[in-house]
Amino acid sequence: MATLAPAERHEDLTDICQQVELACVHIGSLDETERTKASDILLALPQSPCLVDVVRYLLTQSTQDAVHFHVLGAFLTGIAHVDDLLQLEGVCEWLLQRATHHASPAYVRARYVRAIVILSLRMTGLSTRTTPNSTSLLTLGKHAQSLLRTHDIMGWALASALAHEFLDQDEDRTSAGLRENEFVWCAALVQVAVIPDLVPVLLSSFHATGPSSPVWPIAADCVQAWLGWRCVSLPDTPSSHAELWTYVRDTPPEPPLPGVTLRVSPPLAPLYLHPDVATVLGHAARQAPSPVPTACYEAMLHVANYRPWSKEVAGTWPEQRAALLHVLMDLTEMPNASDDDIAALQRVTHIYTQLMYTDSGCVLMQGAVPAPMLLEALVRVSTVCLHVAFDRVPRGSQATEASDAAVD
């Protein structure tokens, strides 16, 4: 696709814009030749040597949402090969302003925010090859905080996209084209400098969200993602971000932690191990429409899995155990007779069992909650398990799945 390579003159950019707009129309054509040609044009777009200029021009000149969607997709594909930090910085801020002030459908907005997050990660990681600079990632966190305070859906979207970028456990965890230690440094910066400021604002906004608010689904997804954060092992008090980079660069990567436990690093313990986290989730589960309570229960499972980094930094963790059990007892009742909520029963049962497992269970049994409440919780768990095993399995249309749930 040599026609997409030159982008230095206005007429070249105009020609590219026309080609891409036409390709977006023909990509769904019944004619195989037209579909193939359109696909070739869109697949060639990320290879343009002037990708940033082409993307800015197309997003500015075209009024078609489909064009914006495909152009941003091409940008996400090609961004790992762009190394000009000044150019990346300019387009990142431009994309943020455009996404915030330009009305777009949700599927286009999702690509905007992912592009902004990937750009921020790439700039932060690339800076380690010259002078480590955390500005891009910290600025992204500040933007998300500012937008969250106005209950803007962009704030939730930015925060959610940033959290999800660190949840994937595959080797190729990011499309930002970073080396492993550069990606870990980004995670360390988030843990040290972004989470302490962003997550309290996020939880406060979540608690203040009205029952009829349209932001509930994305907000619940965002909260669930951040409460599932897997803490990076770091020195207790890194004196600077540059020293933090040196530590990450020189420290061999640790094996992943067991999936059943989330060890909370000492600096984050006052935030993540606070009893109010459980209270906020319970409030949202009561107030929000379906399917938000499901996300809240999944977030509660994260909280049930929390463990202090060490016994010396347990802080308010015992009080959080008690608060979460109180919230569960208020929210969950005996299962009803429908056949479609086995997964929900399984999820709630997992929260109870993780909460009453090992050290967490010892805390509860040692007086964090009254003995009658603990006994009632055990009765509820047993009742649900027996209900699934001896009621749902025999009469359910999905007997295999129900049986697996009962055994689990």
Locate predicted features.
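Amphipathic alpha-helical protein-protein interaction segments
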Residues: 6-16, 27-31, 44, 64, ...
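Short, intrinsically disordered, charge-balanced linker/junction segments flanking boundaries
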Residues: 400-407
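Amphipathic alpha-helical segments within extended alpha-helical solenoids and repeat-rich scaffolds
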Residues: 47-58, 86-103, 130-153, 179-209, ...
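N-terminal "cap/leader" segments of large eukaryotic alpha-helical scaffolds
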Residues: 1-60, 189, 204
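Positions within ordered alpha-helical repeat solenoids
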Residues: 44-47, 57-61, 73-81, 97, ...
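Alpha-helix boundary/capping segments in eukaryotic regulatory proteins
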Residues: 63-67, 80-89, 100-113, 117-139, ...
